[in-house]
């Protein structure tokens, strides 16, 4: 089979218990798996298209929308083995799936900050709900030279949830 992990609103729900309606299903693939995944969806009756060559394909079938994500919108990284190896099991619509790891979800969401979309609430809720279960070493390594983005979210977390500062190690 084609390896994938579930991200988006469902992954946030799995990690935090916070439910929100979503218009689509976000599936993450290593780049080499996107074309086979798109073909499989096309064979299942979906219409598929390449949306952005460096990170995103889409599949639609009536009222069903699937994002096939294989990189970051800003082009700094692709979905790699780290996403898959640190994913964990879950159940979606009665089907066993792998859920994107919280650390990579935070890393990915650090770069989503536009006028019409900003994922800060997902980041602070992941920190609130998972706290010291987050592999902060891995997250900081993933963020790398973009550490000011993580710092801004750590500061915002402290502002929004001042009683939960212990959820973030002091060294961060």
Question: What feature does the model see in each segment?
Answer:
Residues 1-172:
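Compositionally biased terminal segments of proteins
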């Amino acid at each position: 089979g084609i390896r994938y992990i579930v991200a988006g609103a469902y992954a946030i729900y799995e990690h935090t218990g916070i439910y929100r309606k979503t218009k689509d299903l976000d599936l993450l693939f290593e780049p080499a798996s996107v074309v086979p995944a798109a073909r499989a969806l096309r064979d299942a009756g979906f219409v598929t298209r390449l949306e952005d060559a460096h990170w995103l394909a889409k599949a639609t079938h009536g009222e069903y929308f699937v994002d096939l994500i294989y990189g970051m919108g800003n082009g700094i990284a692709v979905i790699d083995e780290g996403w898959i190896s640190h994913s964990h099991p879950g159940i979606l619509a009665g089907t066993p799936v792998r859920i994107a790891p919280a650390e990579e979800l935070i890393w990915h969401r650090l770069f989503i900050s536009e006028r019409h979309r900003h994922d800060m609430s997902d980041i602070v809720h992941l920190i609130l709900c998972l706290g010291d279960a987050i592999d902060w070493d891995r997250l900081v390594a993933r963020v790398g030279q973009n550490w000011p983005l993580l710092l801004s979210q750590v500061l915002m977390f402290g502002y929004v949830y001042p009683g939960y500062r212990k959820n973030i190690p002091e060294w961060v």
